[in-house]
Structure formats: C-alpha cells, structure tokens
Amino acid sequence: MRLFSICRLTIVFSGLFLAAEPVCAAHRLIVQGNGKLAIVAADGDIEWEMPWGGIHDIHWLENGHVMVQRGHAEVAEIDIATKEVVWSYNSAQANGNAGKPVEVHAFEPLADGRVMIAESGVGRIIEVDRAGKLLSEMALQRDRPSTHSDTRLVRKLPNGNYLVAQENDGRVREYDRQTGKVVWEYEVPMFGKQARGGHGPEAFGNRLFAAVRLACGNTLIATGNGHSVIEVTPEREIVWQVHQHDLPGITLAWVTTLEVLPNSHYVIGNCHAGPGNPLLIELDPATKKVVWTFDKFDTFGNSVPNSQLLDVAGDVVR
C-alpha cells in the first residue's frame, strides 16, 4: 500500500507539524441541523438562521441564495435576505412522477439556469430548467432499488458524465449522460468486516454518501457507515485512506460530505458520531494531520449530513 496518493506531490518535513491542536483558520459555513438552517461565522457565532427540516444536499449560489431540499422530494432556492423560497421544483409531482414513490437526496445547479436532480424511487437523473421543463433524463442502473437509498450525492463531471454515490448498492458509478451506460464503477469494500446495523459508530457497512473526482483522475469516496474516506485510481486501487480511529481523539461515524480545498486539504462530514466528536473535520491528506474541526453538537445535534464552507477563495471540489 502506498503512503501517499499520486495526486499529492507535497514534501513533508516532520518538524513542521508539531502542534497538538488544529492550526488552520476557522471557517464560515452554512449548515442544517436540529430543525434549523444556519450560517455560522468563523468565530462560531450564528449570524443567520431560519427553521428548516433535514437535508442531504446543499449549494450556495452565486447570487447569494442557497439551494436545499425541502421535505423528501422538493428542491428549493431560498433568498437569504428575506428567508423566502423564490424557486422550487417538486419531483413528487412533476414530469410524470405524480403518484409514484420518489425521494430526492442529490441535486446540483448547472450553467444556464439548469438544475440536475437525482430521483430515487423512479431511478433516474433529470435536468430541468427554471420553468420545470424536462430537458434530459437518464435511467440509473440499480441492483437493489430503494426509494430512500437509490442515491446519496450525485455530481456532474466536467466531461458531462454523472458521478453517482448509489448507497443501497454500495457502489460508485460513473454514467455517460448521453447513453446511460456505466463507464466506470467501484464497489466500496467491507475490509473483511461484517455488516452491522445502526447509524452511529457502532454500525458498519458500505452505504456510501459521496464521491468526487480529483484533478488527477482518482476518485475520493466518503463511505457512509464504512466510517472512512478512501481514494481509488481508475484501476480501482486504493492509494489513500483514513478509517474510524485513525485521527487522534476523533471517532468517525457516518462519513458524509467531501470538500477538496484549493490547498489540497479535505473537509469531511462526520454525521451521527455523538457528543464529543466534530461534525466537520479538515485534514491535510499528505500527513493526515487534523488542522480544523467544527464541533457544534449542542447547537445542531447528531444528524448533520451536509454543509458548505463559504469563505474559501478559489475552486472547491464538492
């Protein structure tokens, strides 16, 4: 097993990493938990909030609005200044889905006002315009169809393909958007362990939550109840990994979101981990040194599946 991914050319000198506590600046972010959507300042103060139910995906928009899910099947855009929903799309009703079991756990705003939406249950990925017109649709390959768990996060790649975290199948699949064919897939390993039920640190499985494509072509995967993040090559070789107890003083539980920052750091979502564990962890993948954590369990509770940093200059992969 390689010590460092081929994506990273960082030279590490042990004498540079002696601090026992996180040393990076804190982040401003938007997050949902305990029945509220909130913007948290870098100093930890809540600078904005409104009542809002649970989410699995979130996107800060260039106009200063935020796009989130509302309920099980609706995508909504909120004007932060007024706290009003200024646009929405209900997958339970639109474009042939009326009367069908549908849940939405992933979506993404695209260029020209298009929105990509992954519809679990009916098993498709669609793109719509802001009038709700169906512009494209593509069927998902599903080994174990599930209205609640067909997908977690889905992202459209620069080449136009879809990278899909298919939770119930335990697989990442990359689809050619034009043909619907799977052009690459990876089954998240169980690492020789038996599946265990639950949502917290005691659980185990390969019900992944997110996958992002790195600039070098490797894929970074948040394994959900696998309590880990792994990086795999196009040839499906694991070249980097961090597991449940690899980070001192931190227990990973349901590992959800991934943000790859311009400085190559990873920000990892740590859901259902219980009090005493951070909700977000920023680490340097070259050293696995934790450089920042977000620990607001008392404010946001034990179910914080998604968030987004708001103060990072440059392109973030998420």
Would you name each region that the model predicts?
Residues 24-318:
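Histidine-/acidic-rich catalytic cores in large beta-rich domains
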Residues 7-20:
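Bacterial N-terminal signal peptides
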Residues 1-6:
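N-terminal secretory signal peptides that target proteins for export/translocation
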